[in-house]
Swiss-Prot record:
One of its GO terms (cellular component) is growth cone. GO terms for biological process: in utero embryonic development; kidney morphogenesis; kidney smooth muscle cell differentiation; long-term synaptic potentiation; lung development; metanephros development; musculoskeletal movement; negative regulation of DNA-templated transcription. Pfam families: zf-C2H2_6. This is Teashirt homolog 3. Belongs to the teashirt C2H2-type zinc-finger protein family. Disruption phenotype: Mice fail to breathe and die at birth. Display pronounced cell death of motoneurons in the nucleus ambiguus and induce strong alterations of rhythmogenesis in the embryonic parafacial respiratory group (e-pF or pFRG) oscillator and cranial motoneurons that control the upper airways. Mice also fail to form small smooth cells in the proximal ureter and urine flow is impaired because of functional obstruction caused by absent peristalsis in the proximal ureter that leads to hydronephrosis and hydroureter phenotypes. The lineage of its organism: Eukaryota, Metazoa, Chordata, Craniata, Vertebrata.
């Protein structure tokens, strides 16, 4: 290939010294007119141009020009036209014989070249037969080059017309060109060189990485973003516009300075995607071209800075829809195709298009790559596309629409009703003619305004983002129309009345009225949920993903059953105090909140849907509700108007919900942060009345009646399944609740206590308290605390009250039942685990267990308040400190929060599942669903947690051959380690019996034993068995050491320290706080 002739670097005039410019331009002796302006500013060259310079000063030769670019843009159309046509003529002079003759007077340097004479020449030129088919008038010049026309210096910045060259009109003429010719002429690049004053490449780095500072060359002002610099240049006129059409075929033309075309360097596709106006979708060769485009068209004012608009592929009219008479070309890239523009649209519609939305053109080149299914008409019909098909509200961004759909659940309804009708959800719009298209676009695109105002947000789009996470299941199960958002969105519907007449087949409210309104559908879906949960529980398959925190495992479903099963002991207490929510661990009835709780900002909540449901299923419940609403109406009128869902829920003392759902419903459905129920409720409590009706229900309650409301025994068949279903719904959806203030929440404090408290409660079984005594203590307990937020540790002190109710709310009345502190403590733990945090998911198997027991009638298997009540207050205080630091937030060690007893059971079961092969090696076999169910029922661990624990152990054993309690399994000589006493055992059978001695019962009896019997056995056998297992020289001293946190005894201080650090995460230095010495018996 012949070597290219060595040339000086090719530069545009803006960057070349005057001498070089003069020298270079002299070679092109065709256009002496331009030399006059390009050369050194001498009288010889300047005189003939004097008059022209006044009208359109060159920025190079007249630094003190009278007109800024702003003024130039606002010059009359006539002068703009003449100046533009001057540029045009100089650029097309070579190949146009006719124009050469016209040009001759211009080459003469006499004063006769006046502006008027030039105007006449240009008018004559425009009326030339070559241009006749363009039908352009002076106000709409095209400045489009013929493919053959070229000019060697057309990209220089020196011609007189450069200041007022109307880039905007040139671009619009191109983008709106209607090709009626059959032949396609090659089109030069859309926008030729534009010189922005930029700094060295070192300062800027790559175009794509951006710059630390963008400086204006004229005044040296620094800006952080290119947009700010562009705005500044536009306001002050500190820029030069040399947008002249050039022809790529001419080798002598001046190329872009120091900035090789990105189209060559980076590949056309990439460069065009990057250097594209986000507003109108045009691609540019260089950043300078794009910037001047922004300045001239003011598009930078219309592009939202933080959230760029989707590339407007909205404008391409599909070929199928084009009318033959109005064929629009769709070139695939700026350089590929072009042609002589033909203006077939009337001036009126052209002006309309130019003034209202100049960017809506058929020329967007990437529409079909950006998801042509909807994007090709995106910008033009954004208000119709980003529109909720359920309630008709329009949104500015897809994110806002998504948030709206999630919050209101409209996406479920729209999809369902569309499927039922067999309708496609969105149909392709019909755009029959260009004029109608233009009219609709003018109406529907607010972006065309030149001020920096994005389309006005509809009220719906401002709906709180907090609610985005609100449960999809809730929305699925409720097809009740959402009234409030519709009212809020009416203004937006009025703004868009034209949408109704548009050709889009969106679903309307009328369509949705045909879909079922709820009622039986909700029951059916809940029924499905329950049956699938029960099936999963029976099959033993894990329900859903693992627990981020091991605390999520402790859901204690059988303790739930105890509390929920003892519903017979509850009685509808007449509310004697104003604004507290009655939550008792032994009450199961879930009367849905009356409508006064509907003052919340989120109109669609469980309360509303379930209220309607209850009314449909049984009107008797509604009667009960009304009875209870009356006293409430008298007692708490001020609270009823509270808009917060939390407080409006707390304002209803009649909702005696089961502690499993009532106590956290307010958090679950509330977009606002959950309030501390205790703080809110306590000041107005009148605890004197608390114990009044406590004794009455005991006789009937102990007989195992499942009457939810003891005043209305015949109604129980109606209420019980509903309360069960509702508790399913609440617990099932509880994982979506995200309380924002867990620290203020009594539930989170309960969660801290749950692990060790349940253990301690299980240890001893003192005689049961009489009902009267309980009533008295109840009153005393609440008298002490009625004026301040409750101290959660008081439940462990020597008031033998029902712990769960005390913890849940200081004003909640606790019926004196014979259920033990174990029951209530674990129930409160369940509440905190099941409801409080999104981290604590709930497996459906636990729900199914609870449900099975809800519908059966049975008495609670309960022992009585435990030895905790006999402990000293000092003891209680240290326990409080100890338990403050147990949860995972404080301790990061793995498995540190497992209940040690549960671990022992799991490890023993795992060891029992090992099978020895003929070669003497052990292979792991899976636990059967029945075995897992037994463990789950006893420990309260969910099936999912058990499955995950087993899977984790198996994974560790396969990967490393060992885990915490078992090493060397793969060698055939396993070593089992006891978690409690660190002894090492060689065979699975010995290990199992060893662990059973710790546990105090045999694993095979696990399924047969009731919780109480196991607790009794633990209390009886724990100390002796551990003394047998651990031996130490210190034993002779006659002392054993007991861990205060879990009441285990150890023979040596070392063992206790080891236990404290391993099991409870305590520092050995603190062992004095948590260890009590016992005399050897």
């Amino acid at each position: 290939m012949p070597r290219r002739k060595q040339q000086a670097p090719r530069r545009a005039a803006a960057y070349v010294s005057d001498e070089l410019k003069a020298a270079a331009l002299v070679e092109d002796d065709v256009e002496p007119e331009e030399q006059a302006a390009d050369g050194e500013p001498s009288a010889k060259y300047m005189c003939p141009e004097k008059e022209l310079s006044k009208a359109c000063p060159s920025y190079q030769n007249s630094p003190a020009a009278e007109f800024s670019s702003h003024e130039m843009d606002s010059e009359s159309h006539i002068s703009e036209t003449s100046d533009r046509m001057a540029d045009f003529e100089s650029s097309s002079i070579k190949n146009e014989e006719e124009t050469k003759e016209v040009q001759v007077p211009l080459e003469d340097t006499t004063v006769s070249d006046s502006l008027e004479q030039m105007k006449a020449v240009y008018n004559n030129f425009l009326s030339n037969s070559y241009w006749s088919n363009l039908n352009l008038n002076l106000h709409q010049p095209s400045s489009e080059n013929n493919g053959g026309s070229s000019s060697s210096s057309s990209s220089s910045s020196s011609s007189c017309g450069s200041g007022s060259f109307d880039w905007h009109q040139s671009a619009m003429a191109k983008t709106l060109q209607q090709v009626s010719q059959n032949r396609m002429l090659p089109e030069p690049s859309l926008f030729s060189t534009v010189q922005l004053y930029r700094q060295s490449s070192k300062l800027y780095g790559s175009i794509f990485t951006g710059a630390s500072k963008f400086r204006c060359k004229d005044c040296s002002a620094a800006y952080d973003t290119l947009v700010e610099l562009t705005v500044h240049m536009n306001e002050t006129g500190h820029y030069r516009d040399d947008n002249h059409e050039t022809d790529n075929n001419n080798p002598k033309r001046w190329s872009k300075p120091r900035k090789r075309s990105l189209l060559e360097m980076e590949g056309k596709e990439d460069a065009q995607k990057v250097l594209k106006c986000m507003y109108c979708g045009h691609s540019f060769e260089s950043l300078q071209d794009l910037s001047v485009h922004m300045i001239k068209t003011k598009h930078y004012q219309k592009v939202p800075l933080k959230e760029p608009v989707t590339p407007v592929a909205a404008k391409i009219i599909p070929a199928a829809r084009k009318k033959p008479s109005l064929e629009l070309e769709l070139p695939s890239s700026p350089d590929s195709t072009g042609g002589t523009p033909k203006a077939t649209l009337s001036d009126a519609s052209d002006a309309l298009q130019k003034n209202s939305n100049p960017y809506i053109t058929p020329n967007n080149r990437y529409g079909h790559q950006n998801g042509a299914s909807y994007a090709w008409h995106f910008e033009a019909r954004k208000s119709q596309i980003l529109k909720c098909m359920e309630c008709g509200s329009s949104h500015d961004t897809l994110q806002e629409l998504t948030a709206h759909m999630m919050v209101t659940g409209h996406f479920i309804k729209v999809t369902n009703s569309a499927m039922k009708k067999g309708k496609p959800i969105m149909e392709t719009p019909v755009t029959p003619t260009i004029t109608t298209l233009l009219d609709e676009k003018v109406q529907s695109v607010p972006l065309a305004a030149t001020t920096f105002t994005s389309p006005s947000n509809t009220p719906a789009s401002v709906s709180p983002k907090l609610a985005v996470e609100i449960k999809k299941e809730v929305d699925k199960e409720k097809a009740v129309p959402d009234e409030k958002p519709k009212e809020r969105e009416k203004p937006s519907e009025e703004e868009e009345k034209y949408d109704i007449s548009s050709k889009y087949h969106y679903l309307t409210e009328n369509d949705l009225e045909e879909s079922p309104k709820g009622g039986l559908d909700i029951l059916k879906s809940l029924e499905n949920t329950v049956t699938s949960a029960i099936n999963k529980a029976q099959n033993g398959t894990p329900s859903w993903g693992g627990y981020p925190s091991i605390h999520a495992a402790y859901q204690l479903p059988n303790m739930m059953k105890l509390s929920l099963g003892s519903s017979g002991k509850s009685t509808p207490l007449k509310p004697m105090f104003g604004n507290s929510e009655i939550v008792s661990p032994t009450k199961t009835q879930t009367l849905v909140s009356p409508p006064s709780s509907q003052t919340s900002p989120m109109p669609k909540t469980n309360f509303h849907a379930m209220e309607e449901l209850v009314k449909k299923v049984t009107e008797k419940v509604a009667k009960v509700e009304e009875k209870m609403k009356e006293p409430e109406g008298k007692l708490s009128p001020p609270k009823r108007a509270t808009p917060s869902p939390c407080s409006s829920e707390q304002s209803e003392p009649i909702k005696m919900e089961a502690s499993s759902d009532g106590s956290f419903k307010s958090q679950e459905n509330s977009p606002s942060p959950p309030r501390d129920a205790c703080k809110e409720a306590s000041p107005s409590a009148e605890p004197v009345e608390n114990g009044k009706e406590l004794v009455k229900p005991l006789s009937g309650g102990l007989s195992g009646s499942t009457a939810i409301i003891t005043d209305h025994p015949p109604e129980q068949p109606f209420v019980n399944p509903l309360s069960a279903l509702q508790s399913v719904m609440n617990i099932h959806l509880g994982k979506a609740a995200k309380p924002s203030l867990p620290a203020l929440d009594p539930m989170s404090m309960l969660f801290k206590m749950s692990n060790s408290l349940a253990e301690k409660a299980a240890v001893a079984t003192p005689p049961p308290l009489q009902a009267k005594k309980a009533e008295h203590l109840d009153r005393y307990f609440y008298h002490v605390n009625n004026d301040q937020p409750i101290d959660l540790t008081k439940g462990k002190s020597d008031k033998g009250c029902s712990l769960g109710s005390g913890l849940l709310s200081p004003t909640s009345t606790s019926p004196a039942t014979s259920s033990s502190t174990v029951t209530t403590a674990k129930t409160s733990a369940v509440v905190s685990f099941m409801s409080n945090s999104p981290l604590r998911e709930n497996a459906l198997s636990d729900i199914s267990d609870m449900l099975k027991n809800l519908t059966e009638s049975h008495t609670s298997k309960s022992s009585t308040p435990s030895s905790i009540s006999e402990k000293s207050d000092i003891d209680g205080a240290t326990l409080e400190e100890a338990e403050e630091s147990t949860p995972a937030q404080k301790r990061k060690g793995r498995q540190s929060n497992w209940n040690p007893q549960h671990l022992l059971i799991l490890q023993a079961q795992f060891a029992a599942s090992l099978r020895q092969t003929s070669e003497g090696k052990y292979i792991m076999s899976d636990l059967s669903p029945q075995e897992r169910m037994h463990i789950s029922r006893f420990t309260g661990l969910s099936m999912t947690t058990i499955s995950h624990w087993l899977a984790n152990v198996k994974y560790q054993l396969r990967r490393t051959g060992g885990t915490k309690f078992l090493k060397n399994l793969d060698t055939g000589h396993p070593v089992f380690f006891c978690n409690d006493c660190a002894s090492q055992i060689r065979t699975p059978s010995t290990y199992i019996s060893h662990l059973e001695s710790h546990l105090g019962f045999r694993l095979r009896d696990l399924s047969k034993l009731s919780t109480e019997q196991i607790n009794n056995q633990i209390a009886q056998t724990k100390s002796p068995s551990e003394k047998l297992v651990t031996s130490s020289p210190e034993e002779d001293l006659g002392t054993t050491y007991q861990c205060k946190l879990c009441n285990r005894t150890f023979a040596s201080k070392h063992a206790v320290k080891l236990h404290l650090s391993k099991t409870h995460g305590k520092s050995p230095e603190d062992h004095l706080l948590f260890v009590s010495e016992l005399e050897k018996q």
